[in-house]
Amino acid sequence: MSEERIPKRSEVPEQFKWALEDIYATDEKWAEDLQKLKAMPERIAAFKGRLGESADTLYDFTQLSDEISVLCDSLGNYAQRRSDEDTANAKYQGFLGQLMNAYVAVNSAGSFETPEIISIEEDKLQKFYEDKPELKLYKRALDKLRRKKAHILSEAEEKILALTGEMGQSPENIYSMFSDADLRFPDAVDKDGKTHQVTHGSYIPLVQSEDRVLRKSAFESMYGTFDKFRNTCAATLSAQIKAVNFYAKARRYDSSLEAALDGTEVPVSVYKNLIEAVHDNMHYMYDYVALRKKLLGVDELHFYDLYTPVVPDADMKITFEEAKETVLKALAPMGEDYLAILKEGFENRWIDVYENEGKTSGAYSAGARVHPYVLLNHKDTLNCMFTLAHEMGHAIHSYLSNKNQPVVYSDYVIFVAEVASTCNEALLMQYLLKNTEDKKQRAYLINYFLEQFRTTLYRQTMFAEFELKINEMVAAGESLTAEGLNELYGELNKLYFGDGIVLDDEIKLEWARIPHFYYDYYVYQYATGYSAAIALAQSILKYGVPAVKDYIGVLKGGCSTDPISLLKGAGVDMATTQPINEALAMFGELVKEMEEAMAE
């Protein structure tokens, strides 16, 4: 693809576009299915007040729910993918709007489901399973719903809580508008006096620059701007944490952490184990910080020095064809069945490969039931090859889950999702390290791997600890002020990075830049997922077929059991600190290897 000009959608060759016709051959077929969805509220309403009536009635309702799930999957995937391939196309924005209206009507019509199911007496439900054996398939789903009984309020109270929904979203919406739409940063200036625009998107590339003057200038531009609005940011974050704690309290949970993790069936101990294990392995990060300072040859290491590569770019230009070929070779340990699905995805246009005008940025995988779809904006870089391996990990997870689970258990939770993608990245990295003889390229790869550990395992755990602490402060009746948040965030940076780096005042404001603090205990899953993936990749390379078989079992499992049990089946026990300790020990070994490689 030409890099001089971004092509229009119509100019992209067919083989580099995803095959959305596999979902609907035409837009008219989509519209026909939308009419079917619009008719669903009437069918749902026929069950109101009747779910506890008989086994047959409850079973028929589960079948209708499955039918609606499949319909929404097809309608949603087609409309969203069409919109994402060219966001300027108003037609598909309209499709999404129509679909959302129909979806809201369906949800509203089915609002009786939870209260009716939790009110069925246990003896009666057991009798239903005996009367209708087919209903047993839904036992786990029904049990999961019924477990929430202690946290479901009276009808009047539920109505009041529902009315607060939009209000509860306000802190995140206000922060998002402030940070993404209103905030402007002064230009950064490089060593030659040339100016560079600073945005949320350009910030990381700027602090990755070899020009230290530019790095410092971008750093001061970003955090100096947030400093001017520190009280606003503290107020929005405080409102968010108060809202989270209000809902947890209203639903009779012991803490906001328990409330957030309950939905994904992850014990609170898993979250706290992660923080404890990383604390026990801080010395590896201190070693890495010391090595980074040494390799950059600076008198003092600052936070704006953390992102710049310590190894000059090894000029690893990798075309999309080469990336596919390398990923296939790297994932060979996964076995022929896995590779066959990977090849099917490569050959049958599951992937939308290159950038075009109006196309959504970044990369993702969407698990449509017909087959997964992957959006890329491929450039010929090492990073883009890792993105391909990562997103195909998600895609094959979706494919195997959909093929092996009934509709009701085909979705998987984020806690497991990040394992499937990151395991592929770990296998790709091990393959490249094993097959790269060029010393410069090898050092570049190790640096890339070390940065993945730093930004995923250490950094996301620090975020998770900060989030836990500010929730605990609010629960204890303490106020969240800009000064207090700065102090806490500064202390955590000191703890995680040690004395080998200067604690710049600006970094204490980083909490104000992170949108994930509005996502309610989300970030820890990046760190746990990374640890589990490293453990699984090591196991696959060490034990071969038996380990692969166990891991494929995880990918086929969907949400047929809780995520901790699912991973335990593949030999990774996330209820303990062992996988995290082992991953961090590997980070320690890589730091040593990097030091040796750069000494030669």
Write out the residue ranges for each language-model feature.
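A well-structured
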Residues: 1-313, 324, 597-600
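Conserved helix-loop functional segments at active or binding sites
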Residues: 329-340, 366, 394, 398-406, ...
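Post-HExxH zinc-binding segment in Zn-dependent metallohydrolases
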Residues: 412-441, 449-451, 455, 529
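Active-site recognition of the HExxH zinc-binding catalytic motif
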Residues: 252, 379-399, 421, 426, ...
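Long, K/E/R/D-enriched contiguous segments that form extended
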Residues: 295-333, 339, 397, 444, ...
